[in-house]
């Protein structure tokens, strides 16, 4: 089938016409409707995807894959989906990932306690279920429980004390929450229970580096010198930066990007080059056209209505476990997939602005992570909203999964609530939380309706403010596939 072949090759747009023709000829074929739903989902057209899956479900209500797909697209579109996930669980009872999706749907419908209870019940039945422990830890952290958020792991380890994967996940959750001091005794317990393991050595090296224990961290990283793993490479680069070993940092970063020109080393290499006075940083980030500032006020829905829509989906009480938010909340899921009119209008305005920005970028530069040859189509690796309140901010961070990243301001504190002239401003090119004494490359004042676009490899954060609300939309533009 031409449509299925196109889908397998990643050519979803080319698949729409043949699938539509096939549906016209065979409107009672549930699999065709399912395939149409998957294609529209990949194209981020969730309204059409939901319609296609609804038709597939009517034609074949007891098919497990159709039921699961239908539940997923309803959830992603921002529609009630818990009942659909209930059906999917009944049809595929062994698939515990559906249970986690059902829990997420319950949270989206305001039933956080029910979601926690559901995961807890399954963990009682299956105490070694790692994904369940991780999900529960994230839920408890976002609910504000930063002390006991990991308690379910202890219950799991009572049942499976020598499960190395469970110990690794336990340690990793502490690292995600930047609870490095608490991670160290868990690492020692893990070694005592299951023996030496590379993951425990990496976790200890990372924790001691982040805690500023540079002598111990240095010994550990030297013992791990032959490890070739992208995540480990980033930990090592952070250590070298914190330790002030700039020549080693530059050499390691250059070696890493030579292996993978879209890898995670660029943000650290930029800082190293700037601190060393190496003007290659200008090739990487110095061109002013890489950053764009756009006023979308006329293209967006009324900002008050958009702000109300966004506030309604900020359901957590606290910052997420493994994100840059401090003193605020972040929405779950892919914001731009939702089908509310305000969100669809928002997405359209953003796509047009990104297209304008990409069109004015300089020509391709060999090896450059942003200035690549093929720059379309525009798609999104993720999209979300952040709501910061008094004292809230983003610590300096980067987005390794993106090509272009962003900040779109929807609501801001009144000027009378700002403690300093630059309170809440966006900073680009600064990594102060890593002990780096470098000024930002650029600072940008937030204004309602203002969109800022910048390379995903560029460090960015925000200055804190004392009071009021800062409501933003953020997204990562997906890096277009390049010709092989």
Q: Model segments located where?
A:
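Non-heme Fe(II)/2-oxoglutarate
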Residues: 281-372
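Catalytic core of non-heme Fe(II) oxygenases with the double-stranded beta-helix
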Residues: 341-351, 355-453, 458-464, 468-484
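Canonical tetratricopeptide repeat
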Residues: 1, 35, 69-70, 101, ...
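Short coil turns that delineate tetratricopeptide repeat
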Residues: 27, 61, 93, 127, ...
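Canonical positions in the second alpha-helix
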Residues: 21-22, 55-56, 87-89, 121-122, ...
């Amino acid at each position: 089938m031409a449509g299925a072949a196109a889908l397998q090759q990643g050519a979803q747009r080319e698949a729409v016409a043949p699938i539509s023709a096939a549906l016209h000829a065979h409107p009672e074929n549930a699999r065709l409707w399912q395939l149409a739903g998957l294609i529209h989902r990949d194209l981020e057209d969730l309204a059409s995807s939901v319609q296609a899956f609804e038709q597939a479900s009517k034609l074949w209500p007891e098919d497990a894959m159709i039921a699961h797909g239908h539940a997923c697209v309803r959830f992603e579109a921002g529609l009630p989906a818990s009942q659909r996930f209930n059906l999917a669980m009944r049809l595929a009872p062994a698939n515990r990932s559906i249970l986690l999706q059902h829990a997420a749907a319950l949270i989206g419908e305001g039933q956080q306690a029910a979601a926690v209870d559901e995961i807890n019940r399954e963990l009682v039945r299956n105490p070694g279920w790692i994904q369940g422990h991780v999900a529960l830890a994230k839920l408890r952290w976002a609910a504000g429980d930063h002390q006991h958020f990991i308690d379910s792991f202890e219950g799991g380890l009572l049942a499976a004390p020598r499960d190395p994967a469970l110990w690794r996940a336990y340690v990793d959750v502490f690292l995600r929450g930047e609870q490095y001091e608490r991670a160290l005794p868990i690492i020692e317990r893990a070694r005592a229970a299951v023996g030496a393991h590379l993951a425990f050595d990496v976790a200890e090296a990372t924790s001691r580096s982040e805690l500023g224990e540079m002598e111990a961290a240095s010994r550990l990283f030297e013992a791990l010198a032959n490890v070739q793993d992208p995540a480990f490479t980033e930990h090592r680069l952070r250590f070298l930066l914190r330790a002030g070993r700039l020549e080693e940092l530059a050499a390691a970063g250059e070696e890493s990007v030579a292996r993978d020109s879209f890898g995670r080393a660029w943000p650290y290499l930029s800082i190293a080059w700037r601190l060393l006075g190496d003007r290659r940083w200008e090739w990487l980030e110095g061109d002013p056209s890489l950053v764009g500032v756009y006023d979308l006020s006329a293209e967006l829905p009324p900002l008050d209505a958009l702000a109300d829509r966004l506030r309604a989906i900020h359901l957590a009480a606290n910052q997420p476990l493994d994100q840059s938010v401090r003193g605020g909340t972040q929405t779950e899921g892919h914001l731009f997939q939702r089908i509310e009119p305000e969100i669809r209008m928002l997405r359209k305005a953003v796509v047009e602005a990104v297209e304008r920005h990409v069109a004015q970028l300089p020509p391709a530069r060999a090896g450059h992570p942003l200035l690549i040859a093929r720059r379309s189509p525009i798609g999104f690796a993720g999209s979300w909203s952040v709501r910061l309140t008094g004292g809230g901010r983003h610590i300096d961070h980067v987005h390794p999964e993106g090509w272009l990243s962003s900040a779109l301001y929807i609501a801001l504190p009144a000027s009378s609530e700002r403690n300093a002239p630059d309170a809440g401003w966006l900073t680009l090119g600064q990594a102060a939380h890593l002990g780096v004494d470098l000024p930002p490359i650029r600072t940008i004042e937030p204004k309602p309706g203002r969109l800022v676009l910048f390379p995903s490899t560029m460090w960015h954060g925000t200055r804190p403010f004392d009071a009021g609300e800062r409501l933003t939309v953020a997204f990562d533009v997906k890096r277009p596939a390049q010709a092989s």
